[in-house]
Amino acid sequence: MIRKHILSLLILLIYVNFSSISQTVINTESNLNKIDSTFHLFIDGMGDYKKGNLDFFMIKSNLTVGSRVKGKNLLRLTFSNNYQKFNGNAFKNNISGQLRYNYFYNVEKHHSIFSFIQIGKSMRSFIDRRFLVGGGIRKRTTPSKNAGYFDVALGAFYENESYPTYKFQEVEFSPKTYNNLRLTLNIFTRLKFNTHWNLVTVMYSQWKSSRLKNYRIFFDTTLNYIISKRATIFLKFNARVQSEPYIPFISNETDTLIGF
């Protein structure tokens, strides 16, 4: 019986280390180039169910709806969820949704002004609710379409976060809500090495305006090998770093994923 529980725990720990990162940052970059003047819908999902020596259930999905209007207006609606349960106990329940608008004041150079509104929650990060609204300016520094692009975005957003009651070192902490104004510096790159290999990288950095030592960095990079129009092998890595987490036992998170 003890060996059974140890084996179950090891499987859970391995899965957590390689499962998707628990965060309420939404990466809207992956399908950006595929959205033209027509209506586009992108859906992907996965699920897993095991029963026996251990009970495990997981469902994960991502949905993006987007369209360009008159060439200069880009509208995207993104939704994602990740729910996981082990032996009857949920240990991950993340939901995020975002509406983002870009106005391209220079279509040829891909310079745009953007605004967004987002809401989400993260069980693993102890966030009951995270609400964001903000905007900024995004500029492309590389003109080549064939080799890829390197974009830089500057902006700001209002952040409202709610945390539940929790206990730490035998001390019980009451629910708390934080309201911040954060400054952002974001980097978006897509490098095309040849007809088969490309690298897509996104880096979001978020700095509390009244205390720059309080920052969050989200890094996501994917190396793709394109076999055909319908088949791609990828290696994905992402990380989330918080300099001053509001929950003291919340650590930085990383995720590595290989897929087809």
Q: What is the role of each PLM region?
A:
Residues 147-232:
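Outer-membrane beta-barrel transmembrane domain signature
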Residues 79-80, 87-182, 186, 251:
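Outer-membrane pore/translocation modules
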Residues 1-36:
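Cleavable N-terminal export/targeting peptides
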Residues 49, 65-69, 103-105, 139-141, ...:
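Residue-level signature of outer-membrane beta-barrel architecture
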Residues 252-260:
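Outer-membrane beta-barrel "beta-signal"
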Residues 43-49, 77-83, 115-119, 135, ...:
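Transmembrane beta-barrel strands of outer-membrane/channel proteins
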Residues 39, 71-77, 106-113, 145-147, ...:
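Repeated loop/turn-to-beta-strand initiation elements of outer-membrane beta-barrel proteins
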Residues 49-58, 86-92, 121-129, 146, ...:
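Solvent-exposed loop/turn segments connecting transmembrane beta-strands
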